[in-house]
Amino acid sequence: TITALILSCQKKNDEWIRINQLGYRINDLKIAVYTGLEKENIKSFRVIDSESGKTVLEKNISVKSVPISPFKSCYRLDFSELTADGTYRIEVGNAFSPDFRISDNVYDGTADFLLTYMRQQRCGYNPWLRDSCHTNDGYVIYGEKDDSLHIDVTGGWHDAADYLQYVATSANATYQMLFAFSENPTSFSDNFLASGLPGKDGFADVLNESRWGLDWLLKMNPAPGEMYNQIADDRDHIGFRFPNADTADYGKGSERPVYRCTGKEQGLFRYKNRATGIASTAGKFASAFARGAAVYKSIDPAFSNMLA
């Protein structure tokens, strides 16, 4: 048994069945896709009830798709006629899919789930770490008479797996969250505080997260015509470390550089700030602030007026 388990773990997969990992609603179109690294002449597929192991649907394949490299086989599996609530898997020859659900509640909670990533990426106080990072951001770069002076731009979100921060991505994320709330206010729950820690505060969690973004954007646009579009640069890329233990050296202790919009390429040698547009950055500020002003008009009129 142990030998068989080891051999099965070592076997190289060469065919896969891709499904909607969230699942399918009962009356929705239900499609899976078979892909293989070898040319296969697939005629049919089966849908298996995961609990009983019984076949609940067996169907001939009517649509053969053009495979995309490196695959040599691709088939579209339509099982839309299956409408019974349950957990299933699909089998095609020796290939089988992960289990998936068919139910009208498969998308419940997904809007809130996406906010988990945003809370994880927070700069300043990070609720995942229950600690703070980059609390001395930052010092002005390309600021004319203000060059090298301190400016408070704490907050916002780290952009990716590194700790750089950009208006371009942050303003877009803020706008999208505000837009989602505008269109579907009842889709979001209240399970987290403004700090990102668990708790209820009477506000949808998406509003707390978008407010985190708006507060930071206001710091990055502190006065008319004064816009900053980036914190830190490629000197950040010194390997993995937690944000509250960041040792990247920008020459001013724990402060990081804050790049002012000038319309020109900025930075030295490979430490380039590649954002050269002013109008593009201004537009992103404007869209986030305009949507925020509309959303907060009835929630926090004073904050709405600040954004307008």
Which residues are covered by each model-predicted region?
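Bacterial Sec-dependent signal peptides at the C-terminal "C-region" and cleavage site
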Residues: 4-14
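Low-complexity, Pro/Ser/Thr- and charge-rich linker/hinge segments at domain boundaries
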Residues: 27, 97-132
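Aromatic- and glycine-enriched glycan-recognition loops and surfaces
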Residues: 77-80, 158-168, 195-215, 271-280
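Ligand-binding face of N-terminal immunoglobulin V-set domains in extracellular IgSF glycoproteins
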Residues: 16-104
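Well-ordered alpha-helical scaffold segments within catalytic/enzyme domains
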Residues: 92, 163, 174-197, 215-223, ...
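Carboxylate/His-rich catalytic cores and anion/metal-binding grooves
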Residues: 205-231
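Active-site lining segments of carbohydrate-active enzymes
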Residues: 152-160, 228-308
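Active-site-adjacent substrate/metal-binding segments within catalytic domains
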Residues: 63-81, 129-184, 264-271
